[in-house]
Amino acid sequence: MAKEIENLWREVRELSLGTKIDRFDSQPSPVKFLRNYVSQSKPCVISKAITHWPALKLWSDPAYLTGALSDDVVSLHLTPNGCADAVTGDSDLCFASAHVEKVLFPEALKVVQSSCKGLKVGYLQQQNDCFRTEYSTVALDCDGDIEWATEAFGCSPEAVNLWIGTDDSVTSFHKDHYENLYAVVSGEKHFLLLPPTDVHRLYIEQYPAANYSYHRDTDAFKLEVEEPVRHVPWSSVDPYPSPEKEASERLKFPLFFDGPKPFHCTVKAGEVLYLPSMWFHHVSQTPGDGGYTIAVNYWYDMQFDIKYAYFNFLQSLLYKSSSLNPVLSWREDEDSESSDAEIAP
């Protein structure tokens, strides 16, 4: 079966995806978007999709945001390394989630801007429709939906989320069960993308769920495994290992490093990425003039149709290859819980 799976990786690129992400200078019609991208599960970037948003000019100024949101309490996510919702690199591997505090926005933004990897990294990434709840004061600076996408999908967004971070924050490989329209307002977002067909290349394993707790008196973090133990299926691959780990990582994960290259795209301020449901994505960022990166994303319900059934069948297959060595099997145990639909860059 290994040969057939490897052929699938190549075939989807030859028949449909190509070698790079399509880009447009103007908004596509709903019909074109639905026919050429949604129906084919194919990402694209629209360069001038949100140039009319007031947020593009206003949000690069920290003084505007802290003034407009001066009395608003928001959810601040804290980690020691900028890797929330990710597999830890420690000897006792687990799926680590951030420590979350409710603080006034001006304080939260100050923590984000002063982030230092290895000590404390702040990220505003609450999800759960946070843009229309925690940040409703500035919601009118953006559109309530992506109009041509709403018409194509036939529904309004289920959730709209706001993300504010620095280059110290990284989102590990994961997938979402949503059609995602990802709009960058300030700075840049850098995406590595893999189609659902490449699921075996990400070495998804079951990891015990854990949570960081942050202690202000000592300015230190503690990682605690949840009780009772709950397992989360997550990718084991870090696509950018440190130089001292690169050789060993390549040996452990040859399907990723020796297979077809992931798609890479940079989404700049004013641009929108269409990220199809169930596509795996890893995200890093470059701050803009305000010293942070800001994005707003729109989650639309995906169709749980035949493509979803095909994906479940594919990921249930054992991958065995004498030449590449790994034996992979992904199964959701009865006590495991997939949270990937709730996590996005």
Swiss-Prot record:
Phenotype upon loss of function: No visible phenotype under normal growth conditions. Reduced abscisic acid (ABA)-mediated growth arrest during the post-germination stage, with stronger effect in plants lacking both JMJ30 and JMJ32. The double mutant missing JMJ30 and JMJ32 exhibits an early-flowering phenotype at elevated temperatures (e.g. 29 degrees Celsius), associated with increased H3K27me3 levels at the FLC locus and decreased FLC expression. The double mutant jmj30 jmj32 has longer primary roots. In jmj30-2 jmj32-1 double mutants, reduced brassinosteroids (BR) mediated repression of ABA-inducible genes (e.g.
Query: Which SUPFAM superfamilies does the entry mention?
Result: Clavaminate synthase-like
* First and last residue of the signal peptide: none
Q: Which reaction does it catalyse?
A: N(6),N(6),N(6)-trimethyl-L-lysyl(27)-[histone H3] + 2-oxoglutarate + O2 = N(6),N(6)-dimethyl-L-lysyl(27)-[histone H3] + formaldehyde + succinate + CO2; N(6),N(6)-dimethyl-L-lysyl(27)-[histone H3] + 2-oxoglutarate + O2 = N(6)-methyl-L-lysyl(27)-[histone H3] + formaldehyde + succinate + CO2; N(6),N(6),N(6)-trimethyl-L-lysyl(27)-[histone H3] + 2 2-oxoglutarate + 2 O2 = N(6)-methyl-L-lysyl(27)-[histone H3] + 2 formaldehyde + 2 succinate + 2 CO2
The UniProt record lists the EC number as 1.14.11.68
Is Cell wall biogenesis/degradation among this UniProt entry's keywords? no
Q: Where is the JmjC domain?
A: 122-315
Q: Where in the cell is it found?
A: Nucleus; Cytoplasm; Endoplasmic reticulum
Gene3D superfamilies, per this entry?
Answer: Jelly Rolls
Which keywords, in A-to-Z order, does the entry hold? Abscisic acid signaling pathway, Brassinosteroid signaling pathway, Cytoplasm, Endoplasmic reticulum, Iron, Metal-binding, Nucleus, Oxidoreductase
How are cofactors bound according to the entry's free-text note? Answer: Binds 1 Fe(2+) ion per subunit.
Is Zinc-finger a UniProt keyword of this protein? no
Cofactor dependency: Fe(2+)
* Tissue specificity note: Expressed ubiquitously including in vasculatures, leaves, siliques, roots and inflorescences. Present in the root meristem. Accumulates in cotyledons and root tips of young seedlings.
The record lists Fe cation as bound by 174, 176, 281
Q: Which GO terms describe its biological process?
A: negative regulation of gene expression, epigenetic; primary root development; regulation of abscisic acid-activated signaling pathway; regulation of brassinosteroid mediated signaling pathway; regulation of photoperiodism, flowering; regulation of seedling development; response to abscisic acid; response to temperature stimulus
Q: Which GO terms describe its cellular component?
A: cytoplasm; endoplasmic reticulum; nucleus
MF terms (GO), sorted A to Z: histone H3K27me2/H3K27me3 demethylase activity; metal ion binding
The top EC class is oxidoreductase
Which family, according to UniProt?
Belongs to the JARID1 histone demethylase family.
Q: What does this protein do?
A: Histone demethylase that demethylates 'Lys-27' (H3K27me) of histone H3 with a specific activity for H3K27me3 and H3K27me2, and involved in the regulation of gene expression. No activity on H3K27me1. Together with JMJ30, regulates the flowering-repressor FLOWERING LOCUS C (FLC) locus by removing the repressive histone modification H3 lysine 27 trimethylation (H3K27me3), especially at elevated temperatures (e.g. 29 degrees Celsius), thus preventing extreme precocious flowering.
User: Can you name this protein?
Assistant: Lysine-specific demethylase JMJ32
Task: Please name the source species.
Answer: Arabidopsis thaliana (Mouse-ear cress)
Which gene name does the record give? JMJ32
